[in-house]
Amino acid sequence: MKIKAEERVLNFLQNHIDYILLALILCLSVGIRFTVRFFENGDAINYLIPWYEQIKANGGIFGGLSKPIYSFDGTVCNYSFVYQFFLAILSHFPIKPLYGIKLLSCIFDYLTMFELARIITLLIPEKKVQKSRIAVVVFAFHPVVFMNSALWGQCDVIYCFWILLALDMFLREKHRLGFIFYGIAFAFKLQAVFFLPFLLFYYFYKKRFSIINFLLIPITALVLNIPAFIQGRTIKDVISIYTGNTNMYKIISMGYPSFWNIINDGLKKEGYSSLKYVAIAITVAALAIHMYVWLKRGVALTHKNMVYMAFLLTFTTVFFLPSMHERYGFVYEVMALVILMLYNKTLPLYLGLSTITLVMYGKGLYSTNYNVVLMAVANLVIYIGYTYLLAKKMLKTETE
């Protein structure tokens, strides 16, 4: 015979089983990230940890940004002052450098998953609970996500979060906030520029706000660099980090299975010198073709179509540009999860996309060998598949 207290507990558990299960799942995802905190790879040993230790030695938030910091091989740090300042804050806590670096990215894992839920709730109000929960669980346990932040210690999820927040604001037509959040993403990492083609198209097609709003991007970035300016760094120093990133790599691909890997394995500088400007030109042309078709066919700027457009333009930019790292697809891969919740026919493409990225991460983390040409061809097939399915969806006369 049950006592009343026991019955109340059982009733509570039954009535809140969905929330309890979700909480348990999220706790398990935290546990996964915790178990890999010890892992060190070349990026952590040669770059991230030396940067962290130098920032701490220079005074943390009270001087850690006052002078250049260097990697193990003597290369000057090419991560933004905004990211460096976050490391400076962490340096004042009693935590190992490696754990602090990973903790920062893991915090943004969870901010990003809840921003995903917020976007999906807006896009699919009739199934917002079911779809948003599925997306949160998939993101929480996605190997690419926790490998990037908790295993690798990289910060791609940080600028990804701010890009998603910017996209959310544009969906809600809060344009100034959208530009401010995009400015924060850009302040963290130059790779936020992959989202810029969508913003330019959105501005041109929407005609709802002034081009002056684009000034909010550099203004926001400069405001976030105030801690560095206070410590003696200059605007020239800020700009040099971005320009240094564009000139650092001299091979056609840095691990990402780009279009150009179909004809060049990316290991020789000769391929880079002969294809660099061709690749940039083809990227611009591919972006222009997408935009032209949407304009000529009068594709409606519905919320769902905006997400499709943002995804395709970001994917196009990364796929055709030279010198892309394997991690640079992170933003469009997260957008692909949103699209999967909108359009379940993209499931095979999403699984293929995730598998390719896992193979690339295996190379970066564990030196696993793979056929780069085969991966590039597979990525091309997935790109074409997404282009076809989403174009078919967008070109329907009725709005969704």
Residue ranges and their predicted role:
Residues 1-35, 107, 121-122, 132-134, ...:
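Start-transfer (signal-anchor) and selected internal transmembrane alpha helices
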Residues 2-3, 8, 194-219, 230-231, ...:
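Perimembrane helix-loop-helix junctions
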Residues 2-3, 35-41, 238-257, 292, ...:
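Transmembrane helical bundles and short interhelical boundary loops of multi-pass, membrane-embedded
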Residues 14-50, 59, 106-109, 141, ...:
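Transmembrane signal-anchor helices characteristic of membrane glycosylation enzymes that use polyprenol
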Residues 47-78, 82, 92, 232-242:
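Extracytosolic helix-loop segments that constitute the early lumenal/periplasmic catalytic or substrate-binding loops
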Residues 81, 85, 95-114, 270-281:
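Loop-to-helix entry region of an early transmembrane alpha helix in multi-pass inner-membrane enzymes
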Residues 115, 158-175, 335-336:
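Specific aromatic-rich, kink-prone transmembrane helix
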